[in-house]
């Protein structure tokens, strides 16, 4: 498999400029884990199915990833971590491919990154992702 990531939407490139967003080997980077890498490439192959109003749920459906709509209160084993890994990857995939994210998807992606921070600790790469998601404009779900 090629080590190059799928070309990013200009809005993604402008906002998510830290090296982790182009790092295919860092397990804590959005596309560095096997799950993140596979999800990005699976969805990129069907990119024409993503409209300007595509949602996080659309990305999860295209990738055929079965995650719960809610986090629930009592995770079983590592279920929260596994779901959070897929949700974070899906959120960043949507942003990378379309330059936008739906408000509900934005919140779920932030929640997923927070779960990963709880699981792995306050690693700088995860803190960077959270900060970048927090600063993503929410008035409009699309940047230029």
Name every feature range the model reports, one short phrase each.
Residues 24, 81-97, 130-134:
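Amphipathic alpha-helical elements of HEAT/ARM-like alpha-solenoid repeat scaffolds that form extended
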Residues 57-81:
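Acidic, Ser/Thr- and Gly/Pro-rich intrinsically disordered linkers and low-complexity segments
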Residues 72-76, 81, 90-121:
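Long protein-protein interaction modules used by eukaryotic assembly/scaffold proteins
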Residues 39-47, 65, 96, 107:
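Catalytic toxin/effector domains delivered as secreted proteins or via bacterial secretion systems
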Residues 113-144:
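Eukaryote-biased recognition of C-terminal alpha-helical segments
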Residues 2-57:
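Short terminal alpha-helical segments
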């Amino acid at each position: 498999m090629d080590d190059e990531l799928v070309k990013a939407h200009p809005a993604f490139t402008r906002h998510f400029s830290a090296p982790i967003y182009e790092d295919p080997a860092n397990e804590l980077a959005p596309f560095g884990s096997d799950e993140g890498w596979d999800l990005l490439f699976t969805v990129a192959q069907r990119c024409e199915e993503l409209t300007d109003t595509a949602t996080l749920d659309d990305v999860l459906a295209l990738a055929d990833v079965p995650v719960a709509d809610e986090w629930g209160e009592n995770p079983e084993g590592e279920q929260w971590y596994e779901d959070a890994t897929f949700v974070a990857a899906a959120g960043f995939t949507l942003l990378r491919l379309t330059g936008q994210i739906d408000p509900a998807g934005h919140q779920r992606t932030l929640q997923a990154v927070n779960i990963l921070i709880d699981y792995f600790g306050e690693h700088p790469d995860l803190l960077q992702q959270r900060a970048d998601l927090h600063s993503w404009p929410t008035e409009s779900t699309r940047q230029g």
